[in-house]
Curated annotation (Swiss-Prot):
GO cellular component terms listed in the entry, alphabetical order: cytosol
CDD domains per the UniProt record, alphabetical: GlmM (cd05802)
Chain residues that bind Mg(2+): 102, 241, 243, 245
Record function comment: Catalyzes the conversion of glucosamine-6-phosphate to glucosamine-1-phosphate.
UniProt cross-references to Gene3D superfamilies, sorted A to Z: Alpha-D-Glucose-1,6-Bisphosphate, subunit A, domain 3, Alpha-D-phosphohexomutase, C-terminal domain
An example molecular function term from Gene Ontology annotations: phosphoglucosamine mutase activity
Record flagged with keyword Protease: no
Protein name: Phosphoglucosamine mutase
InterPro entries, per the entry: A-D-PHexomutase_a/b/a-I, A-D-PHexomutase_a/b/a-I/II/III, A-D-PHexomutase_a/b/a-II, A-D-PHexomutase_a/b/a-III, A-D-PHexomutase_C, A-D-PHexomutase_C_sf, A-D-PHexomutase_CS, Alpha-D-phosphohexomutase_SF
Sequence positions bearing Phosphoserine: 102
The protein's Enzyme Commission number: 5.4.2.10
GO BP term, example: peptidoglycan biosynthetic process
Enzyme class: isomerase
């Protein structure tokens, strides 16, 4: 397949004001997308965004480009990414567009697409859009321009969808939960979902100002949530990222429960009830302890490349239902077509209530192996540190020294200029030493 010029592992992302995250490019992208989706005839496209300030600028640019191509546009306003996937399906739209940089700071932004089925856009459509981006822009005849309208009840529709993922008899009365919305796209919907199910809800970071999204809050900065759970004597805390497709949790002792542990809790509950279809999909970054714990339950486990689109592709290929990443992307295909943080957290709470144990007790059933991850800034000097001979030789040596009781993984981030150095094994001191050794070598090679 031809290599992509603009699309990365999860759409298009970068620094606001730097190509391609500019109004000019977004105008052209909207036009190219509209032209691609209109090849089958008239179409309408949903557009949603998170709460970062640049979203308004890019929403207007995309709207103009789509309309110029003759595509009708439905504006959703600030909504979680999985909500846009869901609403794209329910409105029978040809595609959905999300303006978001997920867990990144406010000065980044990006675009990702959903197909009309609420799934990640097929590669061939992405390539068609890329080709059109390099073609001259034309404008439809006046009578064929796309119409633009705003959907005012999007939040209510999505809240009801989330609630429909649990049995109608579900009552969270007696549950006290702290929710950190990261000043992001879940700030309106998440608290209402849990309140309407009967929980006592304490809300953090739900006052977006366009600049504070993900700033010292949410699933990438859990300290405030940990402190609030302890101060409020809550049963648990739930931390979302800026666009609502990642979730981490905090138990009543203030301990973080990561995506591997949440995935295990959901999968074990389904397995014990005879509801697990197939096995579980993790990633190259999933903790070895998850694989071992699932094996003890007789649950198959496979690893996909890092990125929720690869987890989803593996689930589709195997006709399995459950997968995710330790970062908190969790896919529950029996309920949603993509990673949905609110739905995943609801499934965890249901599993806990069925088993009668606390989140703290449930997480201890998964014995994680020490895993050290070091991010090394990579400026793109022309040298690929991951495939550099000295780095490959060092990785092979460390792997041999661990004698089958650990893993080494080096990979470039698909969304940031980073090389991720991960070492995993039984002895934390040894694992840390190996990781620091490899990170130092990668730094030297990058320099």
């Amino acid at each position: 397949m031809t290599s992509r010029k603009y699309f990365g592992t999860d759409g298009i992302r970068g620094r606001v004001g730097q190509f391609p995250i500019t109004p000019e490019f977004m105008l052209k992208l909207g036009w190219a997308a509209g032209m691609a989706f209109r090849k089958m005839g008239a179409c309408r496209i949903l557009v949603g965004k998170d709460t970062r300030i640049s979203g308004y600028m890019f929403e207007s640019a995309l709207e103009a480009g789509l309309s110029a191509a003759g595509a009708d546009v439905l504006l959703l306003g600030p909504m979680p990414t999985p909500a846009i996937a869901y609403l794209t399906r329910t409105f029978h739209a040809e595609a959905g567009i999300v303006i978001s940089a997920s867990h990144n700071p406010h000065y980044d932004n990006g675009i990702k697409f959903f197909s009309g089925q609420g799934t990640k856009l097929p590669d061939e459509i992405e390539m068609m859009i890329e080709e059109l981006l390099d073609a001259p822009m034309t404008v439809a005849e006046s009578e064929n321009l796309g119409k633009v309208s705003r959907i005012n009840d999007a939040a209510g529709r999505y809240i009801e969808f989330c609630k429909s993922s649990v049995p109608t008899s579900t009552d969270f009365a007696g549950l006290k939960v702290v929710i950190d919305c990261a000043h992001g796209a879940t700030y309106k919907v998440a608290p209402n979902v849990f309140r309407e199910l009967g929980a006592q809800v304490v809300v953090l970071s739900a006052q977006p100002d366009g600049l504070n999204i993900n700033k010292d809050c949410g699933s990438t900065h859990m300290e405030a949530l940990q402190a609030a759970v302890l101060a409020e004597h809550a049963d648990m805390g739930i931390g979302f990222d800026g666009d609502g497709d990642r979730v981490l949790m905090v138990d009543h002792t203030g301990t973080i429960v990561d995506g591997d542990e949440l995935l295990y809790i959901i999968a074990r509950d389904l397995h014990e009830r005879g509801r697990l279809q197939g096995g579980v999909v993790g990633t190259l970054m999933s903790n070895l302890g998850l694989e071992l714990a699932l094996a003890e339950q007789g649950i198959p486990f496979v690893r996909a490349n890092v990125g929720d689109r690869y987890v989803i592709a593996e689930l589709l290929e195997r006709n399995w239902q459950i997968g995710g990443e330790n970062s908190g992307h969790i896919v529950c295909f029996q309920h949603a077509t993509t990673g949905d943080a609110i739905i995943a957290s609801l499934q965890v709470i249901l599993a806990l209530r069925r088993s009668g144990v606390s989140l703290a007790e449930a997480r201890l059933k998964l014995r994680k192996c020490p895993q050290i991850l070091i991010n090394v800034r990579f400026a793109g000097s022309g040298v690929d540190p991951v495939s550099h001979p000295s780095v490959k030789e060092a990785c092979a040596r460390v792997t041999e020294q661990m004698a089958g009781r650990g893993r080494v993984l080096l990979r470039k981030s698909g969304t940031e200029p980073l090389v991720r150095v991960m070492v995993e094994g039984e002895d934390e001191t040894q694992v840390r030493a190996y990781a620091e050794e490899l990170a130092k070598l990668v730094t030297e090679v990058c320099a």
